[in-house]
């Protein structure tokens, strides 16, 4: 979802890959994007690779466990350009309450209209991220500033 929002709202290129991905876009995510006027029907999820990480300026993940897995699988050197999508602007003090995790809509059976409303904050977030990447707005806080805290999170939890 974030890639399509970024490309649509910011008119900028983005890549999309995940640590755990299926063969097609999740139907709920696709319906949410369609409700926002974005066609993602041709999207095919890709698995993240070290080569892809090396090609990117920034990597945004959906939760602390994914950050932990990213550096565990591909190296701590990525911590300087890895961020939590939910809040890439503050340094977390704790991950105990799950506040830095984006809940995947694929596990939510509510109607699309409710999910569209719940995930509306993502539209604003991608615009904020683009501003930060362009040197405007709030500065991004990379994983390198809280790497030890992140490594305390179970990398296999979601």
Task: Give the location of each predicted region.
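Phosphate-binding/catalytic loops
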Residues: 58, 70-158
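Short beta-strand scaffold positions
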Residues: 61-62
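Conserved active-site segments centered on acidic
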Residues: 1-56, 131-140, 155
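Alpha-helix capping/helix-boundary segments
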Residues: 66-68
